[in-house]
Amino acid sequence: MFDRHTLSLYKRLLKYISGYKSAIFITLITIAIIAATEPLSAIILGNLVDESLIEKDPNSFLLLPLQLAAVFIVKGVAEYFSKVMSTWIAQKAIFNIRSELYDKMLCLPQAEHNQTSTGTLMSKVTYDVTQTGNALSEAWIVIARDSLTILALLATLIYYSWQLTLVMLIIGPIVAFFIDRAGKLMRTSSTDMQDNMGEMTHRLEEGLKGYQDIKIYGSEKYELDRFKASAESLRQNTMKVIKVSALNVPLVQVIAAIALSIVVYIAVQMVNAETMTAGNLITYVTAMGLIFEPIRRITNINATVQRGMAAAKSIFAILDTPSEANNGKIELSNVNGQIDFNNVSFSYLGTEKTALNNFSLSIPARKTTALVGQSGSGKTTLANLITRFYQVNHGTITIDGIALDEIELNNLRANIAFVSQNVVLFNDTIAANIAYGHEEYDEQAIMNAAKAAHAWEFIEKLPEGLNTIIGDNGTLLSGGQRQRLAIARAFLKNAPILIMDEATSALDNQSEKLIQEAMNSLRKNRTVIIIAHRLSTIENADKIVVLEEGSLKEQGTHAELMALNSIYSQLYKQGNLSEQV
């Protein structure tokens, strides 16, 4: 059950309950009491036979039944506290593991999120942590309690007849062999179960998020078949674990029953030969019968342990993944906003194509710079590098002459507001979404930000106003309304650097006009980087940068680039800018 690797994992898990020493101490006391009551009940039954039935001792008729009742009462109380305390400890551990895992996921580099599906990560937080918690709550209590019980009963058996006990101990190595073999089989299948659960959760997440596309393209059967394939793989691996577990327990019981039959036969002969009293026989047989139940439970818990250890291995793989590098010590203040790319090269993990190749660019402070180029030209990559979602392979990026990796990461991002075309809103109030990450803002500040983003015009018409719950990712709002809330969030943050990645693509003409008016005000005294589809969002930019396959091809104002009669001019004249930027 516990090979070296399993012990290593379990020891690491135990650190999550090491802070609850008082609760653990109480649990261990109750476990010891439970273990002691098992042989006591067997001894009392033996004494009842010898003293009450054979010797006819009048005092034993009342005393021994009372003792037996007291033992069971004490055992019942101890079992109650043992169950409650062990579950409390395990639930605390589950909370700690789940919180640490989620915190780790939030700190993982963007590249790790790109390689692992959201559904797989969700499965680790929900399913894997639960399996690990079961191993902590059930396994340690069963192993501790039943190991002590077995030792107590074994001591009783040896005391009453060490010769008979030797016969029973022969089954020990046989039982251990079957438990070890079953453990290895269940560990493999349990690991596959974790993967199947992650894949199934991923399929479910994709289906629920993209249900409109699934319906419009008539792909319901295709998606259902993919989901059923994942669910079937999970079912098959679950059945493998169940079959091994179901075979393991009765096999051990059959071996134990054979040993019991042999021992009972020999013991009866000893009673007939008057080398053992009838009471001692009852005590011995009762103790031997009692010892098989904790053996069965320990054998049965093997499946839970293996599932938990497979899940723990999966969890620790995430926890051991390096977090985002944050070695910077400099805290920015009074940011001017000059951004420089100096011979920067970058490629995404797992791809051979270079996204940026020896790229250099100066983005002037407190000016608006627009990035133009076809899909894959490197526009969004530049934005992701400025925010340090990714690290450059070569070269440096500086803000006001300070390299990004020398700036404390949280401080860097505190000075940047980011509005993406993929608006992320939360199932909370409008006010909470606008003030996201800045709970200290009062309602008036939130209202002013909403007005600046021209979001107030629809917010004030809602029955609950700023307190309106907007649904999962703002599903109760239109695309333009969701976009304006995201822009209001950027207004409220009031960072010296603003990045707008196609931020007005979801707006109608009227909404865009209102946003452009607000943006003209927001641009003052801050560095603005715009990646937009529509010409109206970049025509008035202080600087337009034309990118192509990760290289800078042209830069200048709209008038200057038109005069060059090159890439930008051709896009403009062909009327394709709105589709190719």
UniProtKB/Swiss-Prot annotation:
Signal sequence, renumbered to the chain: none
Enzymatic reactions: ATP + H2O + lipid A-core oligosaccharideSide 1 = ADP + phosphate + lipid A-core oligosaccharideSide 2
Entry keyword annotation includes Cell wall biogenesis/degradation: no
Annotated binding of ATP, by residue: G373, Q374, S375, G376, S377, G378, K379, T380
SUPFAM superfamilies assigned: ABC transporter transmembrane region, P-loop containing nucleoside triphosphate hydrolases
InterPro entries: AAA+_ATPase, ABC1_TM_dom, ABC1_TM_sf, ABC_transporter-like_ATP-bd, ABC_transporter-like_CS, ABC_transpr_lipidA, P-loop_NTPase, Type_1_exporter
Segments forming domain ABC transporter: 339-574
Annotated membrane topology: Multi-pass membrane protein
Cellular component terms per the entry's GO annotation: plasma membrane
Major localization class: membrane
Bilayer-crossing regions: 24-44, 61-81, 158-178, 251-271
Domain notes: In MsbA the ATP-binding domain (NBD) and the transmembrane domain (TMD) are fused.
Function: Involved in lipopolysaccharide (LPS) biosynthesis. Translocates lipid A-core from the inner to the outer leaflet of the inner membrane. Transmembrane domains (TMD) form a pore in the inner membrane and the ATP-binding domain (NBD) is responsible for energy generation.
Protein name: ATP-dependent lipid A-core flippase
Organism from which the protein derives: Hydrogenovibrio crunogenus (strain DSM 25203 / XCL-2)
